[in-house]
Amino acid sequence: MSEAPQHIPVLVNECLSLFADRNPKFFCDVTLGAGGHAEAFLSAYPSIVSYDGSDRDTMALSLAKERLEKFGNRVHLHHASFEDLAQNPRENVYDGILADLGVSSMQLDTLSRGFSFQGDDHDLDMRMDTSKGTTASEVLNTLREEDLGRIFREYGEEPQWKNAAKAIVQFRRHKKIITVRDLKEATTRVFPSYRLRKKIHPLTLIFQALRVYVNQEDVQLKVFLESAMRWLAPEGRLIIISFCSSEDRPVKWFFREAEAMGVGKILTKKVVMPTYEETRKNPRCRSAKLRCFEKKSS
C-alpha cells in the first residue's frame, strides 16, 4: 500500500444537514485531521466567521493548513489534545462542535505510524502525537499479562483477550515485539480458524485496543464531553462520530444523562450511519455512527 496519506471525511452531508436550519458563526472542530469536514462546513456556510480546528497529529495539521488556506482568517489551527482544550476558559461560544473519533484513513495509510496491520516491517508506534507518550511496542513489551488482557478486553472487546495476552508475554521472553510482523508472529495461534477466514483481519480488535490505550482515548473523550457542554452556545449543536462501541457507548450515555438533567436534547433519536453508497465508495466508514446533541436555549 502507498505511503501517501489520504483523507476521506465520513458522513459529511449528514453533518452539514444538522445546521441547515441556521447560520452558524462560530465553529469548533476538535479532530481536524486533514480538514475534510472543515472544508465542507466553511464552503457550505459562509456565515462561519471563525472555525477553530485542533488535532494532536502534527502531520494532519500541516495538511489541513494547506487545504484550508483558501479560507484565510476564518480558520484558526491549534496543536492540542482534548485535555489541552479542556483548559480553554471559553463558555457559551460555539454554535457547532464536531468530533470525529478514532483513527483516520490518512493515519492508517501512513504505514510508518504503526496504526495498520498491513505495514509488516514498520514499528508499532500508534501515537497520535508522536512528540510524546508511550508507543504500542513499549506497551506490549513491558505490561504484565493481566494488564494486557484487560486492555484487549475493555478497549477492543476481543473475545480471545486472555489467550492473546498470554501469547504475547510468552513470545517476548525470547524476542521483543517491535514491528507489526512481530505482533502477528506472537499471536499466530491465538485466533480460531473461522476468524482467519473472515474479511476482517483477526488483529483488528487488538490494534484498536492498543491505539485506544496508547492515546488514552477513553480519558480524553470523557474530558472532551464535559468541556463541550460548557463551550456550546445556547442552542449550539455537538456532533460526534464514532467507529466502535467503546467510543459510541460513552457518548450515547452522556447524551442521555445530559438530556435527563435538562441540559438540552438529543437530535438523533436513532444513530445516523453511512448510506450504502458511501460505504461502497469508502468501506472503512461502514462502522461509523453519528450522534448529535443540542444545548437548551438558555
From Swiss-Prot:
Organism: Chlamydia felis (strain Fe/C-56)
UniProt-annotated location(s): Cytoplasm
GO molecular function: rRNA (cytosine-N4-)-methyltransferase activity
Cellular compartments per GO CC: cytoplasm
Listed EC numbers: 2.1.1.199
Keyword Methyltransferase on entry: yes
Encoding gene (name): rsmH
Substrates-to-products reaction catalysed: cytidine(1402) in 16S rRNA + S-adenosyl-L-methionine = N(4)-methylcytidine(1402) in 16S rRNA + S-adenosyl-L-homocysteine + H(+)
Protein task: Specifically methylates the N4 position of cytidine in position 1402 (C1402) of 16S rRNA.
Keyword vocabulary terms for this entry: Cytoplasm, Methyltransferase, rRNA processing, S-adenosyl-L-methionine, Transferase
A biological process from GO: rRNA base methylation
Homology family: Belongs to the methyltransferase superfamily. RsmH family.
SUPFAM superfamilies attached to this UniProt entry: Putative methyltransferase TM0872, insert domain, S-adenosyl-L-methionine-dependent methyltransferases
Name of the molecule in the record: Ribosomal RNA small subunit methyltransferase H
Binding positions for S-adenosyl-L-methionine per the UniProt entry: 35-37, 55, 82, 100, 107
InterPro entries (alphabetical): RsmH, SAM-dep_MeTrfase_MraW_recog, SAM-dependent_MTases_sf
